[in-house]
């Protein structure tokens, strides 16, 4: 049944009211202490030694690679083969570790997690970002479409094999129940276990939450970027996941179809807004930090994002109040001298100047509007306002030695700049601070909240034994 106009309007009103209300405090920045972190997680480590093309990445707060063989990084990605016994079907359709989650063994999976985590994150300190990248199936049954339908088919077959006399509708309902229950147990208890092993890290699943707003392909002329109402409701079905996560990692990879169009900003904006909505909804006293995955290039080929699309991705994410962006890439980005040279030129000419601009603009806004105890968030999420350094007030100057910043701003905020920030942005305070400009110190209360937050990591293991004992092998 198609949703009517009434529910859509109601949802829109709820979202606007939620945005207009007081922002919950969030975790303080990690790594550099900046309100907006920019991370480079692209496997370009071979550009210098193999292809003789060194890349200057000093402007990034974090440098890491998602490739195998690298440990103790500030950002760690756990793919399906790096964390326990993730049930899935491979590309040939062969069942691996049971295929569907209800056919997997949580009893065998959980004990392997400690070894997996300690292999890639070898020390407790310092904290970092830990991203679980499990994309083979989705925990909401109806979202397993197209090539993921194999998980629904297999689930139905398992039920039908046990109950050959059941009608198809009963088989389907039971299959959905068993799949969603098992998927929840696998994801939930994995999160609980790994948080207990490395409690200083911020843990979450890549691409959660998703917005499913890719309908620009079919509806280019009428495309708005809004998340379908039904998908927002389905995200709320995952309240158990958001309650256990300590960070959210949505993705805003741009297809070249969207290049430099008004749709690119709408596509990104509503995906980030949905993540921020989820971040504020499922914890009573704090909001989860949101780190947005993006790419330095469009999803097909090696064409760097245009200036317009850098604003639509990095700039939009910063203005909406995300904690940072993570640039991800694959081995093709550094597969030859030509690709490395292209990235080198792109970094120097376009990407680095822009991220330095935005990073410092968010920092200045935090200092002047939030006493350095919070990050600036756009008052109107739909407004065409950004955290950019005013070219009339600042210029970027290069460092002259490797120990100096790659680029740094020179200048100061004008009265007009300060008025602009005050008019268009408000503060989201870090835990321990409150007030309109984060001027009130609540660190005693925040300490209790932080201990409760961290304590949930340590106590979560208590429930795992019971789950494991009742798991159907």
Curated annotation (Swiss-Prot):
GO cellular component entries: apical plasma membrane; cell surface; cytoplasmic vesicle; cytosol; endocytic vesicle; Golgi membrane; lysosome; membrane raft
E.C. number: 3.2.1.35
Disulfide bonds: 47-340, 211-227, 365-376, 370-427, 429-438
Membrane topology: Lipid-anchor; GPI-anchor
Coiled coil: none
Signal sequence, start to end: 1-20
Tissue-specificity statement: Widely expressed, with highest expression levels in kidney, lung and liver (at protein level).
Lipid-linked residues (GPI-anchor amidated asparagine): 448
Segments forming domain EGF-like: 361-439
Protein keywords: Cell membrane, Disulfide bond, EGF-like domain, Glycoprotein, Glycosidase, GPI-anchor, Hydrolase, Lipoprotein, Membrane, Receptor, Signal
Similarity section: Belongs to the glycosyl hydrolase 56 family.
Assembly with partners or alone: Interacts with MST1R.
Protein name: Hyaluronidase-2
Organism from which the protein derives: Mus musculus
